[in-house]
């Protein structure tokens, strides 16, 4: 009925199809699916937090600051230092110029 050669050919074909994932389906996306936060369009992802890329951006952006803003007006949620939170946010989700402006010259 079936020859050994035919069975081997059928098994090798099934193994090749399974290896390329042709029978697999992607997992359905539900409301409970955890997605990593996406970077905002036009934002800078500066990783690692506090690394050379963040320091370079900080040194380039802060001299461009035009108006003074109180740091406590915008960022007063009490969860650690503003600089540390900004560095982590810039690495995880990306940050814009205005996010870094808020930490420029906090004493001036």
Curated annotation (Swiss-Prot):
What if the gene is knocked out?
A: 33% reduction in the larval diapause in the presence of dauer pheromone compared to wild-type.
Q: Which GO terms describe its biological process?
A: dauer larval development
What is the native source organism of this protein? Answer: Caenorhabditis elegans
Q: Which gene encodes it?
A: ins-17
User: What family is this protein classified in?
Assistant: Belongs to the insulin family.
- Known function: Involved in the regulation of the larval diapause.
- Keywords tagged on the record: Secreted, Signal
Where the protein is mainly located, per its record? secreted
InterPro entries listed in its UniProt record: Insulin-like_sf, Insulin_CS
What subcellular locations does the record give?
A: Secreted
Q: Where is the signal peptide?
A: 1-19
Secreted: present as a keyword of the record? yes
Q: What is this protein called?
A: Insulin-like peptide 17
Lineage of the organism: Eukaryota, Metazoa, Ecdysozoa, Nematoda, Chromadorea
Q: List the disulfide bonds.
A: none
* Cellular component per GO, a single term: extracellular region
The entry's note on the tissues where this protein occurs is:
Expressed in head neurons and the uterus.
PROSITE patterns named in the record: INSULIN
């Amino acid at each position: 009925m079936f020859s050994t050669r035919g069975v081997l050919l059928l098994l090798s074909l099934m193994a090749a199809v399974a290896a390329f994932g042709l029978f697999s389906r992607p997992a359905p996306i539900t409301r409970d699916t955890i997605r990593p936060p996406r970077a905002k369009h036009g934002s800078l992802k500066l990783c690692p937090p506090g690394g050379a890329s963040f320091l370079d951006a900080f040194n380039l952006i802060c001299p461009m600051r035009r108006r003074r803003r109180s740091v406590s007006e915008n960022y007063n949620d009490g969860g650690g230092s503003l600089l540390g939170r900004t560095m982590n946010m810039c690495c995880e989700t990306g940050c814009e110029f205005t996010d870094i402006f808020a930490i420029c010259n906090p004493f001036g």
